[in-house]
Amino acid sequence: MPEGHTLHRLARLHQRRYGRAPVRVGSPQGRFTEGAALVDGHVLRNAEAYGKHLFHHYSHPAGGGRVVHIHLGLYGTFSEFSTEDIPDPVGQVRMRMIGAEYGTDLRGPTRCEVIDEAEVGDVVARLGPDPLRADADPARAWQRITKSRKAIGALLMDQSVLAGVGNVYRSELLFRHRIDPFRPG
């Protein structure tokens, strides 16, 4: 499963390639057709990551904006291409987004849905601080960890404690600091 840093990289890439301009959004597979229609032709205002969640914020003429919420899960991937040579969709492309110069295909996500800004807040409220965000509050994570008797390895994987950490970072962090993953928080 991609860890938080991968989603932050994707958010920066999508912001750079598609941000502040109208994009075409479709669903060759058909499972996201209704959601794609809600944002197709709209301006991608901002792409941001929070933990393992990716949010594409779109402007909307009626106001309020719409957001495509993506969680890649175990199998989700994005593949990029140039609009000079747009390939036919291969495999189960849930969402295809095409900008002026680049396009991207999303395959196999756990979640790909259109939500509103309030629902973004609901998703984020269930998560712990994301250490890669400037607005992260590390004291919040520290408080949850130190008050728990759960194993530190399990706490680091708990997205409500610390958002974005996966098995690779958990293992490396504990190994480098010589902390037993079964030690209580």
Positions of PLM-derived features:
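Structured catalytic/nucleic-acid-binding cores of DNA maintenance enzymes
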Residues: 1-185
